[in-house]
UniProtKB/Swiss-Prot annotation:
Its main location: mitochondrion. It is found in: Mitochondrion membrane. It catalyses: a ubiquinone + NADH + 5 H(+)(in) = a ubiquinol + NAD(+) + 4 H(+)(out). The chain crosses the membrane at residues 2-22, 54-74, 82-102. GO terms for molecular function: NADH dehydrogenase (ubiquinone) activity. This is NADH-ubiquinone oxidoreductase chain 3. One of its GO terms (cellular component) is mitochondrial membrane. It is a multi-pass membrane protein. The keyword Calcium does not apply. Core subunit of the mitochondrial membrane respiratory chain NADH dehydrogenase (Complex I) that is believed to belong to the minimal assembly required for catalysis. Complex I functions in the transfer of electrons from NADH to the respiratory chain. The immediate electron acceptor for the enzyme is believed to be ubiquinone. It holds the Pfam family Oxidored_q4. The lineage of its organism: Eukaryota, Metazoa, Ecdysozoa, Arthropoda, Crustacea.
Length: 111
């Protein structure tokens, strides 16, 4: 089994090394790197602005989604199980983090 994984690793390594040597070198010019709009300079920036508040709300939602995922199996666990104490400790850390973010003002939408 180890021989199979070693041979796969070596094959991938050889292919990547050969790809680096065979790869056509491309010189980056300003004209080649810029977007093309009918021969004129672009009117707008290609980057769209993104509010960091939406990103923070998304992260908080993701964290508490994982918390719910961990809390659902607690219905079937024995309350004296070490896993139960670990999940309760993890939940306590998450709730303490939310209170800290709230006290710092990161959760207030309008300042």
């Amino acid at each position: 089994m180890i021989l199979i994984w070693l041979s796969i690793f070596m094959l991938v390594f050889i292919m990547l090394t050969l790809g680096m040597f065979v790869n056509k070198k491309v010189s980056l010019d300003r004209e080649k790197s810029s977007p093309f709009e009918c021969g004129f300079d672009p009117l707008n920036s290609s980057r769209t602005p993104f509010s960091i508040r939406f990103f923070v709300i998304t992260l908080i939602f993701l964290i508490f989604d994982v918390e719910i995922y961990l809390l659902l199996p607690m219905v079937y666990l024995n309350m004296s199980s070490p896993t139960t104490y670990l999940i309760i400790f993890f939940t306590f850390i998450l709730v303490a983090g939310v209170f800290y973010e709230w006290s710092e003002g990161a959760l207030s939408w309008i300042k």
